[in-house]
Amino acid sequence: MKFNNVLETIGKTPVVRLSKLFPNHNVWIKLERTNPGGSVKDRIALAMIEAAEKEGKINKDTKIIEPTSGNTGVGLAMVSAVKGYDLTLVMPESMSVERRKLMSAYGAKIVLTPRELGMKGAIAKAQELAEKENNTWIPQQFENTANPEIHRNTTAQEILNDFSEGVDFLITGVGTGGHITGISEILKQRFPQLKAFAVEPEQSPVISGGAPGPHAIQGIGAGFIPAVLNTDILEGAVLVGKDEAFSFTQRLAKEEGILGGISTGASLAAIAKKLGEIPQNATVLTINYDTGERYWSVDGLFEENIISE
């Protein structure tokens, strides 16, 4: 296949059955790690920038500034590299060093904020930076309607093509809320039996009505309910702890040969918790958000297995 640039390769990601982790159930995972920037956020990065171009919100001299926990930043950095935009990314210092290096490799500038302030601190800092200069634009992934819209128009359509027989359960994490919103809204029109469950860290259960807090599951659990998240389409939320998320991230690699990130492991742990309520013949879908290669430096996640002869 030939493409004019790398951005044309975003989307059309494969779906794989998890036959070893869940041998007695019909559980599938959509591999968003196969996007060129390595995550599901490539979709919204391109969508937000192209929507802003179409609406005249940005030009070649615009400085783009965005708060991000990592994957959206990587996607924006990749898109900005191709399109030639100046990009500054603001992220909590608790995010992995691999993410920072990836964004820097694409040419983005990085500003770190205190870990205890979470994403709220990164958002506030991005606003502060934008107010200091002229001709700046903040994509605002947590509020930008292009976020769920791209999932309605692409991700959900791909799933419909792959699952003509239907999907019964969507169990997936909430970062911005864009993919669970866009996918669920479209799938429920075709498959009214679909039940959608959000996955969130047990240390920051805001969708479940709890208080925000620091946690170790990078990529989900922003500490607030994002504006783009349609909570009306959710049947509920499943809380997952660090150890469960780490364990399933490790098992996914060792048993299924899929190297995913921590949030992917969290979604698998959530599925394991819900299995008792799921009929064996039901179709369950989750999302692999990114690649585990972004988390080598996370203590206790992936350990070396060196033996001496």
Residue ranges and their predicted role:
Residues 1-309:
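PLP-dependent amino-acid enzyme catalytic core
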